[in-house]
């Protein structure tokens, strides 16, 4: 992870499974506040990337529109990247790359001041984005 106390955090969701299939929490304000979630949810988006190898990003908003986001993989897998773009950061342009997958139940918290993007690993990768600021 980048050399910042307030950097990206890999989140491992804990699904509950039984004979009916599975249930997993996507967002919990109390749990995410512990890792820096700044406040209310302003927008939730869904993306589907049809072809393996497709790159999407790098996206970020500068103040006063800076946003935090929780990126959750709900189908397939992606190589997800967050880049520190804070003007005053000694770690500026450092990055973290992690694999997010629906099977592993992984997500990433991307705080304000980080650009975000990903590359789809298999065909038909799907992500849910939870944003702190509306786009």
Sequence positions of predicted segments:
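Non-catalytic, conserved peripheral segments adjacent to functional cores
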Residues: 1-103, 122-124, 131-135
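Short beta-strand His + acidic residue motifs that chelate non-heme Fe in jelly-roll/DSBH
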Residues: 81, 108, 116-121
């Amino acid at each position: 992870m980048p050399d910042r106390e307030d950097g990206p955090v890999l989140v491992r969701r804990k699904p509950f499974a039984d004979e009916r299939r599975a249930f997993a929490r996507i967002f919990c304000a109390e749990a995410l506040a512990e890792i820096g979630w700044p406040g209310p949810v302003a927008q939730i988006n869904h993306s589907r990337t049809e072809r393996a190898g497709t790159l999407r990003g790098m996206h970020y908003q500068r103040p006063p529109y800076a946003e935090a986001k929780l990126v959750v993989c709900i189908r397939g897998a992606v190589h997800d990247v967050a880049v520190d773009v804070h003007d005053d950061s000694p770690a500026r342009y450092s990055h973290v790359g992690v694999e997010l997958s629906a099977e592993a139940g992984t997500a990433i918290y991307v705080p304000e001041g980080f650009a975000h993007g990903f590359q789809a690993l298999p065909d038909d990768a799907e992500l849910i984005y939870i944003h702190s600021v509306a786009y």
